[in-house]
Design a protein with these regions (language model features):
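Flexible coil/turn residues that form the inter-helical turn or adjacent wing/linker of helix-turn-helix
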Residues: 53
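Amphipathic alpha-helical segments that form the core helices of the histone-fold
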Residues: 41-48
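N-terminal first-folded block
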Residues: 1-29
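Short capping/connector residues at structural and topological boundaries
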Residues: 16-17, 38, 76
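A general alpha-helix detector
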Residues: 21-25, 43, 56
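Helix-rich interaction surfaces within compact, conserved domain-sized segments
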Residues: 5, 56-96
Length: 96
């Protein structure tokens, strides 16, 4: 699967995102997404559709109803960067 991406691996054209794209991007990073992680990615996309922005981690944790600490345990590199990357969303800026 060949998709245009930024230097950090984010989709250049977010409209090319799909569940298949999400799983392929994760696979390329040697990440097997759990059901919980897929749900978080879908909720991040929902939040973005409603607010036209990527939420800060504290806001996102409340939005999905998961403790912030648990989010960090599920995503070893921190939650919002892989969630937005695999979700076809813009790369977060600032403190996430």
């Amino acid at each position: 699967m060949s998709l245009d991406r930024t230097g950090n691996g984010y989709l250049v054209d977010p409209t090319t995102w799909s569940l298949d794209v999400m799983h392929e991007m994760a696979k390329e990073d040697d990440v097997a997404l759990s059901e919980s992680q897929v749900m978080q990615i879908e909720k991040a996309r929902e939040y973005f559709d409603e607010n036209s922005s990527v939420p800060p981690i504290r806001t996102f944790a409340k939005y999905v109803g998961i403790d912030k600490g648990k989010l960090f345990k599920e995503w070893l590199t921190g939650p919002l960067k892989p969630i937005t990357k695999y979700g076809g969303l813009p790369q977060p800026t600032g403190c996430v």
